[in-house]
């Protein structure tokens, strides 16, 4: 925390030299804090690299002793990955799955946020439809897939619906919770300063709910990835799911791990992207600026 | 903002009653109070006697159960014109910068950006927050955050300033600094306004008040109103050195300790 500047009200036009000195101190403090943060970041990166080497090393040595038709090693997987990327095979199967992910997730974000806000704002809508949402959220989505196939076929449309259903609920529910959890104290501040309802939503409720919404998006991403592979496996077997099934059924263990690792990396990458967006749109939730 | 002729009381409560939970909890009952224009009224009283509720009623944030409450001579229906509030919990919006928080009240009341800029900058300077315009509340100390709360209210140029234990969450030194700043501000003729200041600190009440209202609990009502013997201008040292300071302080403390009705003493077994 910064020190309280000792400026009293009697002295409205402050002493410029003192003010400049204070400004310099502030810059100094900011630089020192930044240096400390950078050091800590590097240290953490180093620890992770070491850990990665140890785990991969154990896998490499241990994995090599096992039956290679059931198990593979990191070096073999890397070789397979390079081959699959160079030949375009990985991308060929990943692209259609990503497209489904993109469609389904986008629709889920829009519908989820809008519905969450409506449910939170209008108690009639909440009372009339809230229990369907609870019910559907509690139903394992996989159980609905045969029905979706009957209705929408085996292709992109069906897969998009499946993805939507996997991703939609956490977004709606978190948006709803975010609005319901806005501190009554802040709402009262808005009312005390005579906000209109629209202004109250814009300046108080929506920003306060934003971190919840982002958490919902993060949950939805995880579920969306599950939905993506599930859709590939349970409808027309295609995309990245097909790649896993095909390589597994032919005991190409090294090639099979490539799409699996790719999915993991994809999840990490998307969460990281979301975190960047969050810092951009909700800078007050940043925790790393504190000492 | 609202202009009321100086002889209309700023606030007038007539047999005002506020109950919660279908009448199970009485915040205050049959309360009569008059706050004159430009007067600083400090309210002290035990916890739970209805001080915050009274302030929220004046701010139009909650309805009366019965009786009348007038602000600038008009019955309160929703937040009245010319009233601004400073909260014990600061109530800053974490997603807005210091400047935007300070501008919030003005903007919500439709001020144009030129006015906003002029007034917010002026009060940010006045409370020593120059250069912090772009900081966010979480980057500030508690004392600085409450200064922003003060700027937000003052920038609206209210004719009535409501303060609910504004300095209670601060450490003793910061509290004293802010008390002195507020005192200095209220001695500027152009800044003087009616102020209702709730506090648990008798010293703070003695320092700031024209009059001090002592509230009692269950049901909350105004027990006694004392007129401050300290004239204007005044300062912390002068007030505390005045022989009447210790006397008044002892008196108020004894009032707050001893309920007027001895039957309201709780048996010792219940207090632990
Ligand atoms: N919204 C509410 N619903 C129900 N009861 C309430 C509500 N607000 C206040 N009360 C009750 O009304 C009484 C007065 O509360 P109030 O907050 O006004 O007291 P206070 O004098 O400000 O106390 P403190 O000094 O602790 O801040 C208390 O018994 C409190 O529990
Ligand atoms: Mg209170």
Specify the residue positions occupied by each region the protein language model found.
Chain B
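The feature captures the beta-strand-to-loop junction immediately N-terminal to the Walker
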Residues: 44-46
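Helix-to-loop junction immediately C-terminal to a conserved catalytic motif
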Residues: 59
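Conserved ABC transporter NBD signature motif
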Residues: 67-79
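Short coil-to-helix segment of the ABC ATPase nucleotide-binding domain corresponding to the Q-loop/switch region
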Residues: 96-103
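Conserved ABC ATPase "signature" region
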Residues: 107, 114-132, 184
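Conserved ABC ATPase signature
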Residues: 136-140, 144
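A short, proline-enriched helix->beta-strand linker immediately N-terminal to the Walker B motif
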Residues: 155-159
